[in-house]
Amino acid sequence: MKTILAAALFAASASAFAQEPAKLAQDKACLTCHTVDRKLVGPAYKEVAAKYAGDKEAMTKLVKKVRDGGQGVWGPVPMPPNPSVSEKEAAVLVKWILSQK
């Protein structure tokens, strides 16, 4: 019985991190300022993917930017820090953003 309970708990926690990236972006309020195809307040995810294409440090840079915020890269409006986004969630989001073509 303990084995079944442990397996169920593991599956539930794993599915939380396997959450669809677009839903995660919505849940974390990323889509308040960003869209996939066009600039809103912040850049479109396709613009971000194009800018960082071929940059081997993109994942590290952008995970940090998602969590800590930043300014000056895409214009005068700063991106606020997002402390409610875990490092794992930020990595899922950034991987998805960088996959936009």
Language-model regions: role of each:
Residues 21, 58, 62, 89-90:
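Stable alpha-helical elements in mature extracytoplasmic
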Residues 41-52, 65-94:
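Axial heme c-ligation environment in periplasmic c-type cytochrome domains
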Residues 25-27:
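Short sequence/structural segments immediately N-terminal
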Residues 14-18:
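Sec/Tat signal peptide C-region and signal peptidase I cleavage site
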Residues 29-36, 93:
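The canonical Cys-X-X-Cys-His
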Residues 97-101:
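Short hydrophobic/aromatic patches at helix-to-coil boundaries
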Residues 3-4, 19-20:
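Intrinsically disordered, low-complexity linker/tail regions enriched in Pro/Ser/Thr
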Residues 4-13:
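Sec-dependent N-terminal signal peptides
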